[in-house]
Amino acid sequence: MIHIDNLWKSYPARREKLGFKEFVLNLHKILKNRDDVFWALKGISFDIKKGECVGIIGKNGAGKSTLLSILLGVANATKGIVDIKGRRTPLLELGAGFHPDLSGRENIIINGILLGNTKKEIMKKSDEIIAFSEIAEFIDMPVRTYSNGMYMRLAFAVAVHTEPEILLIDEILSVGDEFFQVKSGEAIKKLINNGVTTVFVSHSMDAIKSICSRVIWLEHGVIKADGDPADVVGQYLEKGR
């Protein structure tokens, strides 16, 4: 389902902004280092099988977001092989495709189409989506009138009802109140149990151990460990002490 082989990703190294005088005085260094790059990912390789749920952990700057952006297709690898088979549904920035002046009902259709469904398919699911979101009385109001919690509930409801083949999740299990968070977690577990391949990036080790069947630990752009959630999370927490 997901095959990654010797994946490298680089970005231009950040440079300090210099005034004209500093630029002239440091010109020899600038010319010497003009090809400097920052390697966010350094030759990582792994495979994820259909129906597998893999957690990605690591400190900020470890390469998690870069990897997720490549898996999603919004960034390209500098070198290496990225082979992904299946429709990808992101649970990253919920409601990114929502239009504030349109109603919740209209945004269900638009967002559902953006996530790969036909209008007919999403119309069939709309009642179920509205019920799951628990905002039925506001569904025909413009989403700009929604609270942040209502907005996120509706966006999450749309995403989990679009029959994804590959689910890419980044820290979104804090949607709504505590009750809705539990409901959200159960919805994701149901998708996983139904064979949806899932990649879950999180700083919550409890959520990782609860949902994932395997964990990859990234550190400075390389894979530090890959295996059983309890073992890998244990190693990660031990090093952080």
List the predicted regions and their residue ranges.
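Pre-NBD coupling/linker segments of ABC/ABC-like ATPases
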Residues: H3-W39, A230-G234, E238-R241
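Conserved ABC ATPase "signature" region
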Residues: F23-H28, I109, E121-F138
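The feature captures the beta-strand-to-loop junction immediately N-terminal to the Walker
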Residues: I57-K59
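H-loop/switch region of ABC-family ATPase nucleotide-binding domains
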Residues: S202-H203
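A short, surface-exposed alpha-helical micro-motif characterized by mixed small hydrophobic
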Residues: I208-S210
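Conserved ABC ATPase "signature" C-loop
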Residues: H220-G221, Y236
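ABC ATPase "signature
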Residues: D226-G227
